[in-house]
């Protein structure tokens, strides 16, 4: 009886702590996402914030950005196949960073071009349902600006 009670207590404790995307003995995890759920095409919309005074050339309120995220099993982006664009221009720009698969925390660097020291930083959270909420800072810390110095709130959705 004692060993059965101990076993049940251990099972309930493990299930309560389960936060991975994989189930534990049939008990589903929660809070995590998979690389497959993040990989795909994304659309982001920016809105200026008052955190930084925006300089000339900054993105406009409501401006859309698109990205192709190729996420590896450890959450890092495959830099050779991940990219972003500022429509309507067709220029494909490099993207690096990663997504914490345990909780969706996202930190991406959007470069002006390959080998450039001009970059923006996109930080926030991606959900398993295909949404993003966070902020965009131009320039990223230690980088030069891509468009014009500004800080934005960002909403995004996975489009495919």
Predicted regions mapped to residue ranges:
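Detector for intrinsically disordered, low-structure N-terminal pre-sequences
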Residues: 11, 24-26, 70
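Short, solvent-exposed loop/hinge segments that bridge or flank secondary-structure elements
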Residues: 32-79, 112-121, 143-158
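Sec-dependent signal peptide recognition
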Residues: 2-8
């Amino acid at each position: 009886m004692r060993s059965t009670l101990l076993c049940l207590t251990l099972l309930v404790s493990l299930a309560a702590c389960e936060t991975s995307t994989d189930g534990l003995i049939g008990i589903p995890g929660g809070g995590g996402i998979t690389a497959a759920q993040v990989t795909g095409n994304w659309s982001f919309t920016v809105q200026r914030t008052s955190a930084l005074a925006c300089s000339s050339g900054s993105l406009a309120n409501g401006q859309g950005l698109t990205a192709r995220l190729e996420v590896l099993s450890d959450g890092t982006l495959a830099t050779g196949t991940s990219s972003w664009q500022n429509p309507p221009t067709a220029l494909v720009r490099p993207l690096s960073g990663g997504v914490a698969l345990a909780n969706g925390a996202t930190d991406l660097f959007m470069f002006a071009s390959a080998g450039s020291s001009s970059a923006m930083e996109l930080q926030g959270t991606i959900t398993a349902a295909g949404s993003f909420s966070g902020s965009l800072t131009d320039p990223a810390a230690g980088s030069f600006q891509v468009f014009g110095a500004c800080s934005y709130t960002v909403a995004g959705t996975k489009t495919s």
